[in-house]
Amino acid sequence: MDILKKRNTALCVMTLCILAAVLLGGWRGTTREYRAIQEAFTSGDSSPKQYLDTMLTRFAYLVKLADTYGIDTAEEMSLYKEMQNAYTLDMVTDLKKKERNLYAKVKQQSLNKEDMDYMERDHTMFVSSAASLTHIDYNQKALTYNKEMSRFPASLFCSLYGYEKALVFQ
């Protein structure tokens, strides 16, 4: 029991308590902010997820129509399936490019009136959703979040706990 009365023991215990408090406080703060930005991404009237889901749905319709007219859509289908699980900015950029290219290919086909009308409607909705992504309030929240989380000590806690930067659509 003499070990409890030594100064070095007290310093070690105090250091461990301070370290635990800093880690716990950092975890709580960064977790709260991370959850808030994730919530902003997935829910609400103008969440990015809503627009991305619309884009994916309209893209899937275009892929199905292209298949009907014998156009190879293996790459497009692969991207579509990959985006069912997660989004990255590169994927969204690739989705826009592939939709634009596939739309041009399908438009060159001899489409019946009904298919042409549906394709035009879906393309318009896709383009509208893609444009809306750049004008929603979420982007400002994401920029603020990324700025705050890139500063010390938040950056340390984000890397320690595996919190990634928020997607910003510009």
Please place each PLM-identified region on the residue numbering.
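A helix-centric hydrophobic-segment signal that preferentially recognizes long
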Residues: D2-Q170
